[in-house]
Amino acid sequence: MAVGKNKRVSKGKKGAKKKVIDPFSRKEWYNLKAPVTFNVRNFGQTLVTKTIGTKLATDGLKGRVFEMSLADLNADEDQAYRKIKLSCEDVQGRNCLTDFHGTSVTRDKLCSLIRKNYSLIEAFADVKTLDGYNLRMFCVGYTKRRPGQLKSTCYVRSSKVRLIHKKMVAVMTNEASNSTLKELVKKVIPESIGKEIEKACKSIFPLQNVLVRKIKVLKKPKFDLTKLMESHNYSGEEEGHTLKVKESENATNLLTAELQSS
């Protein structure tokens, strides 16, 4: 028998179940708001740990990047091949105000455009928009058979590839430098930049299926809350409207009626 051992002291059972705490009880939901560039403004919700002491919930939300299909943001299934990245820039109440953070084309779309006996031409350019965003734009295009061509293959010489590269970079730089980020996104979605490249390269070699494959945001300007609010058309007027009810002509003030009767 061990010295000093007290048999009367009851021991706790080994392997006793610990109290299970639901992890979701410490979290809360926030709504995600897309800029006015897209048709669907409320595109989802996100979870974040509740504010505890000096750790604010909003600090955990700012900087988060969300990737969505353009088909969901514009309610158009024909645009499902393009993905859009939106980053949370500010939090207003329970709403996360997001801004454009990049775009890319799905791998399925790119693989569907590749054809045998045709040349693939790629180019990229570092551009800067009017509102101070530094972007890197990637472009891709494919050769096209000339009318009346008898040759089965449609390859292009390296000398012409270099000329097409220069045209692609020039068009992307020109389109970005003469527009804001919002205007540039509106050009990328309907593939208007790709059509401009096709027109510019027509004299060198005909191209087809030209599109902006990817856009990366390299550097953003200093955060401006006013511009972010403008991109969301956000105002406090959505809450607390003053309700004006038109009084009917037959209605009579009770106090006036009492005075008249007396």
UniProtKB/Swiss-Prot annotation:
GO biological process: translation
Annotated GO MF terms: structural constituent of ribosome
InterPro entries in UniProt: Ribosomal_eS1, Ribosomal_eS1_CS, Ribosomal_eS1_euk
One of the Pfam families matching this protein, by short name: Ribosomal_S3Ae
Tagged with keyword Acetylation: no
Entry's localization field: Cytoplasm
Subunit structure: Component of the small ribosomal subunit. Mature ribosomes consist of a small (40S) and a large (60S) subunit. The 40S subunit contains about 33 different proteins and 1 molecule of RNA (18S). The 60S subunit contains about 49 different proteins and 3 molecules of RNA (25S, 5.8S and 5S).
HAMAP family (alphabetical): Ribosomal_eS1_euk
Family: Belongs to the eukaryotic ribosomal protein eS1 family.
Protein name stated in the entry: Small ribosomal subunit protein eS1
Taxonomic lineage from the root: Eukaryota, Sar, Alveolata, Apicomplexa, Aconoidasida
